[in-house]
From Swiss-Prot:
Positions of the UIM domain: 99-118, 127-148
Quaternary structure, from the entry: Interacts with ubiquitin, TCP14 and TCP15.
InterPro entries the record matches: DA1-like, DA1-like_dom, Znf_LIM
Comp. bias regions, Basic and acidic residues: 91-106
Entry PTM: Polyubiquitinated by DA2.
Organ and tissue specificity: Expressed in the vasculature of leaves, inflorescence stems, flowers, hypocotyls, and primary and lateral roots. In roots, expressed in phloem companion cells.
GO BP term, example: root development
Domain notes: The UIM domains bind molecules modified by monoubiquitin or ubiquitin chains and promote coupled monoubiquitination.
Known function: Acts redundantly with DA1 and DAR1 to regulate endoreduplication during leaf development. Together with DA1 and DAR1, modulates the protein stability of the transcription factors TCP14 and TCP15, which repress endoreduplication by directly regulating the expression of cell-cycle genes. Involved in root phloem development. Is an essential component of early phloem development, long-distance delivery of phloem content, and proper maintenance of root system architecture. Involved in the control of root meristem size.
Keyword tags: LIM domain, Metal-binding, Repeat, Ubl conjugation, Zinc
UniProt keyword Glycoprotein present: no
Descriptive protein name: Protein DA1-related 2
Taxonomic path: Eukaryota, Viridiplantae, Streptophyta, Embryophyta, Tracheophyta
Length: 528
């Protein structure tokens, strides 16, 4: 994996959840006695009528004299919720028929009293009064009939308020979710606003979503192919993310020949084409805006950086040639160079101290079908007139990156011209990276709107690039690129470039650049 990329995994359960509809229910009807209660009442009534018929038969066969008997109708005692008769008269004063009649009244009264003990809130289902208890003809006292209670309204269905329209749901189907009820048409997706009619939906807190809407909101998409990033074998969403640009992409794009910008390291999106240089490198559109592609075009920037050194009292007395070269020419020069430390897979700059013949880019290429073509080169013999033969920089890089490379290589030249010998790579590369970082910082801070930003160096950055000022300042895109190049220097993982920069920058911030350089001259190390 690329050193500037990072891997991240997330479980779908943390960003994508599926919940089922709690229930879909038919309307609940309260306040009716079920069929079991009705059948029990009918059975009791049938048994009572059967007993009464037997009683009448026995009375007609063995009836008394028919003497008049005082009959006391049953009374209802409201406090006790029961029915009981008054004490009967002496048996000696009544005939057998009168006694039987009184027994019948007592039995019916007790049966009706039993019905009055039903739990409060129950009623009866009426069907043309077939089940309505009524007094019997043949002497049954109508005053003994006690009508049933009316249904209690407090046991009707519980009122449900719709969580969508805040009105009563009433009868009909309804949905329940997280303790809240909805009309079916009021249960809507929090993202698109349309009703959720599927059996499954997604929840984020208490907010419902269509599954697809929730996936669009939470499931990461690849910024290269613009598809949802797939899950791996463990069911986790695995993707790569650039540490500075936060560009998320599928892991497969690291080995499927997707183009990567040689300057900012961003991958080429499928809907935006990169430019291809003649040596095979790719350049994004933003980096292409300020790319420097030939030696003549780079001369103003080179002299501006020399002026920057002079402004810090580090003037380079020798005129060191500077050439923009192709990748192949730079690699060949590295092979012939005895001095120097190079850790990067692709070296983008070199400070020569040996005599060599180098092919430089004399005329910039022209644009054609997303390619730079028609570049003119020229071999050039470099002779050694001092400790430094020449400075070589890779062509086709944006202005700020080209300047950062020049500032780094010029520091190598300054060290050699000022008698710094046999420095270990961590010290030499580290202090050169500090000068590169300082120049980038001065370029980013040169805009008046950002002058209040803190500086990581104690050295004043009053010398700004006149080359940039002639162009009317830098765009926000170029400033963002400058921040990225600073980020690259500060977070380099190599011991010489990254570790050396952090040690050198700490010393320069604590003691100042001049005292740090004096200590390096005497001891070959950074001051602690």
């Amino acid at each position: 994996m690329d050193s500037s990329s990072s891997s991240s995994s997330s479980s779908p359960s943390s960003s994508y959840g599926v919940a089922r509809v709690s229930h879909i229910s038919n309307p609940c009807i309260f306040g009716e006695v079920g069929s079991s209660s009705s059948s029990t009442y009918r059975d009791k009534k049938w048994k009572l009528m059967k007993w009464v018929s037997k009683l009448f038969k026995s009375g007609s066969n063995g009836g008394g004299s028919g003497a008049h008997t005082n009959h006391h109708p049953p009374q209802f005692q409201e406090d006790e919720n029961m029915v009981f008769p008054l004490p009967p008269s002496s048996l000696d004063d009544r005939s057998r028929g009168a006694r039987d009649k009184e027994e019948l009244d007592r039995s019916i009264s007790l049966s009706l009293a039993d019905n009055t003990k039903r739990p409060h809130g129950y009623g009866w289902s009426m069907d043309n009064n077939r089940d309505f208890p009524r007094p019997f003809h043949g002497g049954l006292n109508p005053s003994s009939f006690i009508p049933p209670y009316e249904p209690s309204y407090q046991y009707r269905r519980r009122q449900r308020i719709c969580g969508g329209c805040n009105s009563d749901i009433g009868s009909g189907n309804y949905l329940g979710c997280m303790g809240t009820f909805f009309h079916p048409e009021c249960f809507r997706c929090h993202s698109c606003g349309y009703a959720i009619t599927e059996h499954e939906f997604s929840l984020s807190g208490t907010k419902p979503y269509h599954k697809l809407c929730f996936k669009e909101l939470t499931h990461p998409k690849c910024e290269v192919c613009h598809h949802f990033i797939p899950t791996n074998d463990a069911g986790l969403i695995e993707y790569r993310c650039h540490p500075f640009w936060n560009q998320k992409y599928c892991p497969s794009h690291e080995y499927d020949k997707t183009a990567r910008c040689c300057s900012c390291e961003r991958l080429e999106s499928w809907d935006v084409r990169y430019y291809t240089l003649e040596d095979g490198r790719s350049l994004c559109l933003e980096c292409m805006e300020t790319a420097i592609t030939d030696t003549g075009e780079c001369q103003p920037l080179y002299h501006a950086i020399r002026d920057y050194y002079e402004g810090m009292y580090m003037k380079l007395d020798q005129q060191i040639p500077m050439l923009l070269v192709q990748r192949e020419a730079l690699n060949d020069a590295i092979v012939g160079e005895k001095n120097g430390y190079h850790h990067m897979p692709e070296t983008r700059g070199l400070c020569l101290s040996e005599e060599q013949t180098v092919t430089s880019v004399l005329r910039r290429p022209r644009l054609g079908a997303h390619r730079l073509v028609g570049m003119r080169t020229q071999p050039q013999r470099l002779t050694r007139k001092c400790e430094v033969t020449a400075i070589l920089v890779l062509y086709g890089l944006p202005r700020l990156l080209t300047g950062a490379i020049l500032a780094h290589e010029l520091m190598h030249g300054w060290l050699r011209l000022n008698g710094f010998r046999n420095l270990n790579p961590e010290v030499e590369e580290g202090i050169c990276q500090v000068l590169s970082y300082m120049w980038l910082e001065s370029e980013v801070l040169s805009d008046p709107s950002t002058r209040n930003l803190p500086s990581t160096s104690s050295v004043a950055t009053s010398s700004s690039s006149s080359f940039s000022n002639k162009k009317g300042g830098k765009s926000n895109v170029e400033k963002k690129l400058g921040e990225f190049f600073k980020h690259q220097i500060a977070h380099d993982a190599s011991p010489a470039y990254g570790g050396g920069f952090r040690a050198a920058n700490a010393a320069a911030c604590k003691y100042g650049l001049r005292r740090t350089l004096d200590h390096i001259r005497l001891t070959g190390t950074f001051p602690l």
